[in-house]
Regions:
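N-terminal lobe/hinge region of extracytoplasmic solute-binding protein
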Residues: 19-108, 139, 216
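Ligand-site clamp/hinge motif
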Residues: 118, 209, 240-292, 334, ...
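Aromatic- and charge-enriched surface segment that lines or borders ligand/interaction sites
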Residues: 40-45, 68-76, 103-147, 163, ...
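Gly/Pro-rich hinge or "lid" segments in bacterial periplasmic/extracellular proteins
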Residues: 71, 77-92, 185-251, 255-256, ...
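Extracellular/periplasmic solute-recognition and catalytic clefts
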Residues: 160-162, 224-235, 260-324, 331-335, ...
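Surface-exposed binding/hinge segments that line
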Residues: 116, 151-200, 220-227, 372-386, ...
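Detector for C-terminal structural segments
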Residues: 54-56, 227-232, 236, 338-402, ...
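Aromatic-rich, solvent-exposed beta-strand/loop patch
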Residues: 98-105, 124, 129, 153, ...
Length: 626
């Protein structure tokens, strides 16, 4: 779910909670009064700096407000400047601990949760964080002034009531074990953010008109030096209210965190080798094998490592826009998928570094397998009239495999033959030099890309599609333009990646729900409008135990895979990262569930040489204060 780093699970059934934390399923790992998380160094020195590039490349940013649809906010802003009522950990996926809220109480009927705010909590302007700020944040984020995904995320919250100066109650529309976590993930900002002088006194701007107003959050960092479109620095707040709190002890150790923006992957890597920044994550196997080489790596100036993790695999694939008529037929989508030769790509381009994505819940317990068992059938049977018969009788679809053995029956030629048959069934036949429908219209596909790196994959894919008579056009556009087109669903086929989750829940409404298909800025890029999917989503978010959640998500995965909404890509089992030697240290314990960027910026710390260098550069400034 969004807004919380909620990772590992203790395997028992049913919701549990206590004053200092809430667990959706199972036990709470850290008891009341715990000293610090196991994976941090509580004595880590403060100081020094780290500079990096965002894992999702931005070509520009033009605002300081991450909560609205229009424009692009800088990387790092949400997690460094704003805070939530509860905070997750890197070693539990469905448990969160008090941050802005010092305790949480869930009602016996589980239809509400009361959060009592920490009296020490302060915004960066010195004001206390009060219940009125929490309600204000909720009301603004669920209004039409905010990006529409927040209305989906908090859609099961009936409302927020102020009970006292530092006490606030979230009322829920129904029993849902995840809802206290969702309420706890609310980003809280000051009621004074966006306050300006007007003719008759101070007025508050609508949230979508707060653009470059300095954020008033409660997080450990403030915005420092900014070059719009190039880089942004965050400076550690020496007076940060939670620096001695157990959920923050040993965290956020750098005095300065700088994100740099480059036009493409090549420019990023060359700048890294030249010493312009400290840390980078690689997502392209070919670049990792061939470009992360040379003198700086050979002489130890730069370190490259493949870091193990226990995360669920990320979902990635070419997503069809079902809002376009030509992609509405599942047989057409399946036929296009048959033209992608993953085995060739893995041999020739990926150095055999990847495994094929099979479903939407990659390398996890939630991935459907084989034929449905009794638990899934109990969920699917009431939907029989809305589902293809093979959902009940056939193995769940797997991506096509391409063999080099002519006798295998699954060579590329065989797969393309099957594709032609599916296209013909759907009314598309080859004539006059192209694949055409009954009206004589040719079948064309436009792939959008923002970096050009996907071109090496699309090119052989396009050659295979051309054998079917499909004309392919690949268009490389700026990230900001791509983001705008994605927000309004102005594309045909696009490559998209979603970070895997150890506890899928309400965020799936954003990815697959019918309502989100018509909501600009939603994650339902495919435009899925399927009543059976909606019914299963409803079951998923109402799961009360871990076994219930597993069965319900598997049933959802099965139905989605029979829809052939994507051409699945691939995933790797490690994080590929590189950094400058001699600048950083890290704890001996590595958490099992983490994303490298957030782990490194929050848990690592600077070496003495790094800290001394920043102090020399800062002179007598407050940067580096303890």
């Amino acid at each position: 779910m969004r807004g919380l780093l909620i990772w590992f699970l203790i395997w028992v059934c049913g919701p549990a909670w206590s004053a200092h934390a809430y667990a959706q399923f199972g036990d709470i790992r850290y008891p009341a009064g715990f000293a610090h998380f196991d994976y941090v160094n509580p004595a880590a020195p403060k100081g020094g700096e780290i500079s990096l590039v965002p894992p999702t490349r931005l070509s520009n940013f033009d605002k300081y407000n991450p909560f609205t649809l229009k424009g692009s906010a800088p990387p790092g802003l949400t997690g460094l400047v704003f805070e939530t009522l509860l905070t997750g950990t890197f070693d539990e996926p469905t448990t969160a601990y008090g941050l802005l809220a010092e305790d949480v109480t869930v009602a016996p009927d589980r239809l509400s949760a009361v959060f009592r705010l920490n009296p020490s909590a302060r915004f960066t302007n010195g004001d206390p964080v009060l219940a009125a700020d929490v309600k204000h944040s909720f009301d603004r984020l669920t209004s039409k002034e905010a990006a529409p995904q927040y209305r989906t995320i908090f859609g099961e919250v009936q409302g927020v009531a102020v009970l006292g100066e530092r006490s606030v109650r979230f009322d829920f529309k129904r029993v849902n074990a995840e809802l206290p976590l969702i309420a706890g993930s609310l980003p809280v900002f000051s009621r004074k953010w966006g306050l300006v002088n007007g003719p008759a006194g101070q007025i508050l701007k609508p949230l979508d008109q707060i653009v470059t107003d300095t954020p008033i959050g409660s997080g450990p960092y403030r915005i420092g030096k900014v070059n719009f479109g190039r880089d942004i620095s965050y400076e550690r707040d020496p007076g940060y209210w939670a620096k001695d709190l157990n959920v923050r002890r040993g965290l956020f150790n750098f005095d300065r965190i700088t994100y740099k923006i480059y036009k493409d992957n090549t420019a990023q890597l060359e700048a890294f080798k030249a010493g312009e920044f400290d840390y980078i994550q690689a997502f392209i196997a070919r670049e990792w094998a061939r470009a992360y080489t040379g003198k700086p790596f050979d002489n130890g100036q730069l370190i490259k490592k493949e870091l193990k993790h226990g995360n669920a695999g990320d979902f990635q694939g070419f997503q069809f826009n079902l809002r376009r008529e030509k992609f509405k037929d599942a047989r057409v989508r399946e036929a296009i998928g048959l033209a992608m030769d993953f085995e060739w790509l893995n041999r020739q381009l990926f150095y055999n570094a990847y495994t094929r994505v099979r479903g939407y819940f990659v390398a996890s317990d939630f991935e459907a397998r084989g034929k449905p068992g009794a638990d899934e059938l109990a969920l699917l049977e009431p939907l029989r009239g809305q589902l293809p018969p093979e959902v009940f009788t056939a193995d769940v679809p797997l991506p096509p495999v391409t063999s080099l053995d002519p006798a295998s029956g699954i060579t590329l030629r065989d797969n393309l033959r099957r594709a032609r048959g599916l296209l013909a069934e759907a009314g598309w036949t080859y004539r006059d030099g192209a694949l055409r429908n009954a009206k004589g219209e040719p079948f064309t596909i436009e792939f959008l890309d923002n970096s050009g790196s996907m071109g090496r994959v699309v090119t052989p894919f396009a050659k295979n599609l051309e054998k079917l008579g499909i004309a392919v056009n690949t268009k490389v556009i700026d990230f900001a333009i791509l983001q705008k087109r994605m927000d309004v669903f102005d594309f045909e086929v696009i490559s998209s990646r979603t970070v895997g989750s150890e506890a899928p829940g309400t965020e799936l409404l954003e990815r697959f729900g019918s309502r989100a298909a018509d909501t600009e800025g939603s994650s339902n890029l495919m435009g899925i409008r399927n009543p059976a999917v909606d019914a299963l989503l409803d079951k998923v978010i109402s799961a009360q135990t871990r076994p219930e959640l597993v069965a319900r998500v598997r049933a959802l995965d099965r139905v989605l895979r029979f829809g052939h909404y994507v051409v699945p890509h691939w995933y790797g089992g490690v994080h590929r990262v590189a950094w400058r030697a001699g600048r950083f240290e890290q704890p001996a314990v590595t958490p099992r569930y983490y994303q490298p960027e957030s782990w490194i910026t929050s848990v690592w710390w600077a070496t003495q040489a790094n800290r001394d260098g920043l102090r020399r550069n800062a002179g007598d400034s407050s940067v580096g204060a303890k």
